[in-house]
Amino acid sequence: MHIDNVVFMKKVLDASAFINGYVPEGRENYTVRSVTEEIRDFRSMMILEDALREGRLKITEPDPESMKVVEDAISESGDIMRLSPTDMEVIGLAVSLRGKDDVTVITDDYTIQNTLKILGIGFRSVLTSGIRDTYSWRRVCTGCRRVYPLDYEFEECEICGSRIVRKRHRN
């Protein structure tokens, strides 16, 4: 499956890229070790192993400074509640590589795409159309509609006693 004609651009692949049949081309493809541990089906494993054996895929980890950038962004947007540690590492690796060259992340994960868009990092989908807008998350009272910070620890509104839920908000 061919995503784009730019073979020399650095690409960071998450598990959904392999699972959805993306075959890395060129030599500038990267992923993190934890992504390789998420690959379980035979076809995806073959794509991954072939790319590693043929030198089309490199496994590397993000630097601590890049992970801090990711943690700050996802804390502010609320995506911290929806991203796994592996997802955060994939985004962190893209931030690490971005300082040197153009980088694109291959992912069908909408939450990863949301964070990448907030950080100004390009992405491509394999099977989905990808996101168009960015979103953040809020905690909102279902009764009086008061907005609470994401780290508000109670489940009931201090004003009216109604339930507090998480809601997506378009930026």
UniProtKB/Swiss-Prot annotation:
InterPro entries: NOB1 (IPR039907), PIN_dom (IPR002716), Ribonuclease_PIN (IPR033411), VapC_family (IPR022907). Residues 9-114 form the PINc domain. GO terms for cellular component: preribosome, small subunit precursor. Residues 136-171 are annotated as: Zinc ribbon. Zn(2+) binds at C141, C144, C157, C160. Residues 130-135 are annotated as: Flexible linker. Mn(2+) binds at D14, D133. Has 2 structurally independent domains; the N-terminal PINc domain which binds Mn(2+), rRNA substrate and probably has endoribonuclease activity, and the C-terminal zinc ribbon domain which also binds rRNA substrate. Its EC number is 3.1.-.-. NCBIfam families: PRK12496.1-2 (NF009145). GO terms for biological process: maturation of SSU-rRNA. Pfam families: PIN_6. Keywords: Endonuclease, Hydrolase, Manganese, Metal-binding, Nuclease, Ribosome biogenesis, RNA-binding, rRNA-binding, Toxin-antitoxin system, Zinc. Binds 1 zinc ion per subunit. One of its GO terms (molecular function) is RNA endonuclease activity. Belongs to the PINc/VapC protein family. This is Endoribonuclease Nob1. It comes from the Archaea. SMART domains: PINc. Toxic component of a type II toxin-antitoxin (TA) system. Processes pre-16S-rRNA at its 3' end (the D-site) to yield the mature 3' end. Its cofactor is Mn(2+); Zn(2+).
